Amino acid sequence: MAASVMLSSVTLKPAGFTVEKMSARGLPSLTRASPSSFRIVASGVKKIKTDKPFGVNGSMDLRDGVDASGRKGKGYGVYKFVDKYGANVDGYSPIYNEDEWSASGDVYKGGVTGLAIWAVTLAGILAGGALLVYNTSALAQ
């Protein structure tokens, strides 16, 4: 009973909302001095050198002059940056390079040595897997 009398005499007052800037030692500050202190500057256009640019240059063969989405072609295709960057778009990461692929596809360009390396690698992976299975089984006990 005395506790209920004591609680009824206590009144709660709303406290004002204040924001204090707290800084902890050893932690970096997340505030910046001024928003214009950070600036990104490009170093300029760097042209790559290729003997011959990869990819198609100049035009695209579109059926009825319309691409798959129904838009009319503009005549320069995807690969239009040979003058600006020194190579076509595909020159940076060519999908097909004649120096790496066989002309007919009948012969592996790596030769017998490449096939031997491939076979040894595959055999090593399979033998390693078999060894792991054996070591974790009851047969190894």
Swiss-Prot record:
Example of a GO cellular component annotation carried by this entry: chloroplast thylakoid membrane
The UniProt record lists the keyword Transit peptide: yes
Pfam families, A to Z: PsbR (PF04725)
Cell compartment(s), UniProt: Plastid, Chloroplast thylakoid membrane
This protein's name: Photosystem II 10 kDa polypeptide, chloroplastic
Role description: Associated with the oxygen-evolving complex of photosystem II.
Similarity field: Belongs to the psbR family.
Annotated positions of the Phosphoserine modification: 59
Keywords, alphabetical: Chloroplast, Membrane, Phosphoprotein, Photosynthesis, Photosystem II, Plastid, Thylakoid, Transit peptide
Keyword presence, Membrane: yes
Record-linked InterPro entries: PSII_PsbR
PANTHER family linked to this entry: PHOTOSYSTEM II 10 KDA POLYPEPTIDE, CHLOROPLASTIC
Targeting presequence: 1-42
GO biological process: photosynthesis
Origin: domain of life: Eukaryota
Species lineage: Eukaryota, Viridiplantae, Streptophyta, Embryophyta, Tracheophyta
